[in-house]
Amino acid sequence: MREVKKIAVLVRDRQDEALRVACGLTLAGDTVDLFILDCLLDMSDPAIAMPMEMITELELMIYTNHPATSFTTITLEEMAKKLLEYDIAVPY
């Protein structure tokens, strides 16, 4: 039996691609969490809104350092410590 991996997807520059990848990584049965760094997601953009709808349905954890969101807000220092818990970090 395969060991379940913890995967962190770091969202910064290529937001739409990061969100699509996060959705795809869930197909392997691994634990996937999102870390949104220094930005807001443009939910009016269908390339962002569609994968975010799936991410919400899958109940993935979403962390951010931007306080103007409905996601779990943590500092960069807290993010750095939390990332040590993951087997893989995928930056975008």
Regions found by a protein language model. Give the residues of each.
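Short, well-ordered alpha-helix to beta-strand connector turns
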Residues: V4, G29, E59, E85-D87
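Short, glycine-rich nucleotide/cofactor-binding loops
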Residues: V4-L19, D38-M43
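Long, hydrophobic N-terminal alpha-helical segment
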Residues: M1-A8, G24-T26
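Histidine-anchored nucleotide/phosphate-binding helix
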Residues: R14-L34
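Short internal beta-strands
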Residues: V32-L40, I62-H66
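A glycine-rich helix N-cap at a beta->alpha junction
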Residues: A47-L76
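C-terminal structural segments of small proteins and small subunits
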Residues: T73-Y92
